[in-house]
Amino acid sequence: MKTMKKLWILMAALTATLLLCVISASACTMVYVGSDLTDDGSSFMARSEDYSNGYNKIAHVNQHGKYAAGSVYEGCYGFTHTFTHDSYAYTATSDDNISGVCPDCGQTHPHTPMEEVGSNEKGVSVSAMVTLSPNGAVVNADPMEDLGICESDMATILLSEASSAKEGVELLLNIFDTVGAGEPSGVLIGDQNEIWYVENFTGHTYTAVKLSSDMITMNPNMGAIGLVDLDDTDNVLSSANLIEVAKQAGTYEGSETENTIDVYKSYCAYANGSPNTRLVNGLNYFLASDTLSASTIAPEDFTISNVKNGKVVSLYTNIQNKLGKISIHDMVDYYKVDDIANIGNLEWHIFQIQSADAPETGTIEWLAMEHGQYSVAIPYFPSLTTDMYDGYKFGGEEATTTDTAPADPYGTYAFSSYWGSGYVVLPEGWENGYYWTVDALSNYALSDQCSAEDNALIHSELAKVQQLCYDKAAEMKAALADMSGDEAKAYATGQSAALAQQAHTLTLELYKHVVSHEHTYGEWETTTAPTCKDEGVATQTCKFCDATQTKSLPKSDGHSWDDGVVTKTATTEADGVKTYTCTVCQATKAEAIPALASDAGSNAPASEPNPATGDSANLMLLGAVMLLSVTGTVFVVKKKILVK
């Protein structure tokens, strides 16, 4: 979710661009599922990054040492950080500043804004962040820091520096303690050993919890940590002032004597209101029903706690799962749930972390662009990925808006927002960008112009490629078990890029089909075979409908001959003739039948020209022996002469 600072800057600008399409600054949705609840023992940590319709994202790999030890990183809004060592290599998905001008802060100094998500060479994965909504009283008691760390900086710093999830947590908490936060956030930091969730609602307060293997938690910008006992320091880390700030604000809920605090009720603005629809729909998704509503959900139904019946227990939530063992398919479908999937989705990602696997294959990062219902999640093995598909790296140009309906709807769509309405015109060459292609398809599919039949077609075709990705991830993992070094990196990078290209190509083909009625034809198939008399026909059929196109095939050079008939009988004095007729054009060809041998009982000499037995054979053999004898004699004589 995008920083509030950025939103206010964008609103103040009032430019006639896609900024008019901003739907909400608080629409990211995070979810975690512990390994005890999954079908393969993986843990899942995931989030959608939501901000605006039509706001390009790019994905890339930052190479080891991009930031040298001692160099200073300057973020969008004044936060700086001095690197303690050469930065680790890591994957990232950032806002599009390819033009050299940051779309978030408008500055030109080198930085990678809103990298949001990635995994580094040490196996540390970060999803940063979900913006939270603090109550006004706690912010007054502990204000945000103007130069504090923001969403725009978090993933960059943590992935560059941290060699473990715990080290990443400690680094972030130290920044909160010393520099402070520029905005409230919820951050996931994990590796193969543990996954942590960190919340801060004010400038210097925070709570971090180590998520357990038998729980589900989610946070659609509401906050997720409820009643916690701060003495459980193995699993709960908090700022020294966490209780004190809430007391100063007059919002503290908990027990000082027991060192407990209900973070949600003490700090979150939602504590005094109703849960949003994304929480309701997300809880119902795991229940496989629609039984819950905003009016029936209490904070205790979804917040994280380590207190039960007055005692410290393992961290848990009361979120119920009726899906059975949860698979990657279930996690992808979570981001297709209404409202969780929305036009503000910029990208969404799922980390599938398997603690028992080798470090190279223990983490799979599933990355999808744009609207959850119209995109495909592509699997990557981030520690082996050295580059990203080119379609993720297209950028540098922004979409524009116009009040006039374009004559050709291709590459455009209508929008309506609080600030106005009009038409979006995608940037030149947008077909080369994976984000823009999904943006075009999803906006058309959600419009009144798209028929129910076309919508069903889109979902059906995308589902086929998504299934291919599930199958391919398993295939890649098995293949990588027998690879190492550069071979493994080349294979993993190439296979993931090929899947992304296939999904991108399909998305563009679907868009052209439903918008411009262009057909994508399959292979040529011979539907009428050519003959010696007539040309044949080959047909192509559209992948998405029954439309066909044909072409002629040249006449065949050959004939279809029958079994033939003897038209002249062979005799002892003359050859015979067998005649064949083409069954298509009636052409004929003749074949000689050898003359018959003479009768065996006649007085004529034998007819065999070269008998294999008898006197002639013996004479030939005798001649050969004599020839060899003479040759041998000559050889011996010559040899003797040479010796002399």
Language-model-derived ranges and their functions:
Residues 369-374, 382-516:
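Charged low-complexity "KEKE/polyampholyte" interaction tracts
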Residues 297, 301-401:
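Long, well-ordered mid-to-C-terminal structural blocks that present hydrophobic/aromatic surfaces
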Residues 28-150, 171-301:
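A contiguous strand-loop segment
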Residues 11-22:
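Bacterial N-terminal signal peptides
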Residues 628-644:
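C-terminal membrane-anchoring or membrane-association module
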Residues 516-604:
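Extracellular modular ligand-binding repeats in secreted and cell-surface proteins
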Residues 604-621:
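Extracellular Ser/Thr-rich, low-complexity/disordered mucin-like segments
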Residues 2-11, 637:
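Bacterial N-terminal signal peptides that target proteins for export
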